[in-house]
């Protein structure tokens, strides 16, 4: 019996779950919106919310804790520079989960998880180019 056991196994080993959540958190921070299954979205939400809170702390120890979880320095720098400043006045509730129907292949419940007040133009490499262009325009 699994009385009082928190979290979902998602039919994966512990190491696979840990790696999957790290990859999903990095993708969510990079693109600010991802489409996944509803149980995965519900599991990744508290992980990313705690990472945003680490970003809001902003000290070296918090940055190292975030890097140990995400394992991508570029994503952590976006988390600490862009996302943490955006939510500086908000106490929690940085993400929203919206149901997005069912997947055709296996009828799995799908969901969109995204940042509240997200940058609608955040599209990975294109987002970096756009931000760099805006910074050059401000500097000039």
UniProtKB/Swiss-Prot annotation:
UniProt keyword annotations, A-Z: Ribonucleoprotein, Ribosomal protein
Organism for this UniProt entry: Rhizobium etli (strain ATCC 51251 / DSM 11541 / JCM 21823 / NBRC 15573 / CFN 42)
Coiled-coil intervals, chain numbering: none
Name listed for the protein in its UniProt record: Large ribosomal subunit protein bL17
Gene Ontology MF terms: structural constituent of ribosome
GO cellular component: cytosolic large ribosomal subunit
Pfam families: Ribosomal_L17 (PF01196)
Family, as annotated: Belongs to the bacterial ribosomal protein bL17 family.
Subunit organization: Part of the 50S ribosomal subunit. Contacts protein L32.
InterPro entries: Ribosomal_bL17, Ribosomal_bL17_CS, Ribosomal_bL17_sf
Keyword DNA repair: no
Biological process annotations from GO: translation
């Amino acid at each position: 019996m699994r009385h009082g056991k928190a979290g979902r196994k998602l039919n994966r080993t512990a190491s696979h779950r840990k790696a999957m959540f790290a990859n999903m958190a990095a993708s969510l921070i990079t693109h600010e919106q991802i489409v996944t299954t509803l149980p995965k979205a519900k599991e990744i939400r508290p992980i990313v919310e705690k990472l945003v809170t680490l970003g809001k702390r902003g000290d070296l120890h918090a940055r190292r804790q975030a890097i140990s979880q995400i394992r991508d320095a570029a994503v952590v720098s976006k988390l600490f520079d862009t996302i943490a400043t955006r939510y500086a006045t908000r106490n929690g509730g940085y993400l929203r989960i919206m149901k997005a129907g069912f997947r055709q292949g296996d009828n799995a419940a799908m969901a969109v998880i995204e940042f509240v007040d997200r940058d609608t133009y955040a599209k990975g490499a294109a987002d970096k180019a756009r931000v760099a262009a805006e910074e050059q325009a401000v500097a000039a």
